[in-house]
Amino acid sequence: MRLHAFTLLSLLGLVPSFAAASLSGSVGPLTSASAKAAKKTCNVLDYGAKADKKTDLGPPLAAAFAACKSGGLVYIPAGDYAMSTWVKLANGKAWALQIDGVIYRTGTDGGNMIMIEHTSDFELYSSTSSGAMQGLGYEFHASNNWSGPRLLRLWDVSDFSVHDLILVDSPSFHFSIDTCSNGEVYNMAIRGGNHGGLDGVDVWSTNIWIHDLEVTNKDECVTVKSPAKNILVENIYCNLSGGCAMGSLGADTDISDITYKNIYTWNSNQMMMIKSNGGSGTVSNVVFENFIGHGNAYSLDIDSFWSSMSAVSGDGVTLNNITIKNWKGTEANGAQRGPIKIICPDKVPCYNILIEDFAMWTETGSKQWYSCQSAYGSGFCLKSGSHHTSYAVTTTTVSSAPSGYSAAKMASDLSTDSGSTKSIPIPTIPTSFYPGATPYSALMSKQSTKAAKARAVDMSVETPAAASRSEQVVQGAPQETGQSAPESAGPVPSGNPGPVPTGGSRPSRHRHGHHHFGSAI
């Protein structure tokens, strides 16, 4: 049974009807991890894995998956594991992967360390919220090699979730969601090197909900690529990152019904960018709402002549029905890079662009500019009218701060980047991702701790062995930076979705995908 699906923003009445679409249906796994584990549990230690940071985890993980791929839970207990051969876990159904240990890359092949493909009803998570993949990318980057392996990729996966996982220092991209559907990604921390090409999350899929993530790197924070439809991205903390984006966009672009909401961007390349250079196709029905930025180079940057990508054949990508609403904060230097830059193709001008409640101000100097080219709509430098002809760049310079630009900051804003030539410690997953917004789901470690404490109260019905298991689960809280996850007694099924953020409503999850039970099996 599925919960009734609805479109979040249309219910709230916050945006025009043309841009109200977000999710098109329910997301998440069809059955709970506890039900999968009850059917069968495949512990990688039983297939030859050793938590000694030397023995290759690849073959035992593949063997455990083969035993549980038709229904079950693959379990990687707490501890430190080396991984020198990559795994492609394909054609699974109704299975889960619980990573409570830390996986260290020791191999040097390209490709993807863990790739999940052609799979349905799937969940990937850490019950302690401290399971991690440590890519040790600095070993590549120190010699100027940026083409090493990616950490995690999902391809052709439906009805899934990925949560409570930490991805660190990938030699290349961290997490790609490729041609998937009905998925939820949440409660994650991604910490990469300070260089381009080390993307946080890239998604080109259908009906995906991405929320409550922190990303540190110097390229994509959470970026939508083509083709993509019905994607909701919210409560995102781009903490010294590249910033969120769409693109790069090329030929036959097909992106529609995308919402970014509650996006906090600190000391990054941009708050939001749509990037292309030539090409064809469309981007339509898009909402960028509730953005806070501080210290970023660019704020809103729509660039249809982006020089960092090679020109693609075509008149350009058509952008239409785009709403930019409730942006506040500051940019690094508004005289150098103004807070609004909308540069559209001359042969296919942008239209129906709406900018409202936009108040940004410069941190350096006393003036800033807004710039538009071949762009139509309402607000700032946009031209009005229904006859959309090309026009040259128009720039408006202002020397007084707009009212209401002041915005909150996050207490965890980083003061220094991670560099790219030294080891990056494993962070903890934060419990806040946007000022004033409560995450939709509590961390697994918090849920497990509460459940274990509740179980420990009733000692009259609990055996000494069970009490020991409860105590171990209580210890499964996030660890200090750089430490390994604690040992646990066994797999802990994922569980109850947490509180709804203030003023928001929860998009539909599959009924059985997130009923977390908390205690050990």
UniProtKB/Swiss-Prot annotation:
Active site: D219, H294
Basic residues biased stretches: 507-521
GO cellular component terms, semicolon-separated: extracellular region
Residues that carry a glycan: N145, N239, N321
Bias (Polar residues) ranges: 469-486
EC number(s) from the headed UniProt entry: 3.2.1.171
Subcellular location: Secreted
Pfam short name (any one): Glyco_hydro_28
Keywords for the protein's UniProt record, in alphabetical order: Carbohydrate metabolism, Cell wall biogenesis/degradation, Disulfide bond, Glycoprotein, Glycosidase, Hydrolase, Polysaccharide degradation, Secreted, Signal
Signal peptide residues on this chain, from the entry's feature table: 1-21
SS bond partners: C42-C68, C221-C238, C344-C350, C372-C381
InterPro entries: Glyco_hydro_28, Pectin_lyas_fold, Pectin_lyase_fold/virulence, RHGA/B-epi-like_pectate_lyase
GO term, biological process aspect, one: cell wall organization
Function, in words: Pectinolytic enzymes consist of four classes of enzymes: pectine lyase, polygalacturonase, pectin methylesterase and rhamnogalacturonase. Hydrolyzes alpha-D-galacturonopyranosyl-(1,2)-alpha-L-rhamnopyranosyl linkages in the backbone of the hairy regions of pectins.
Full protein name: Probable rhamnogalacturonase B
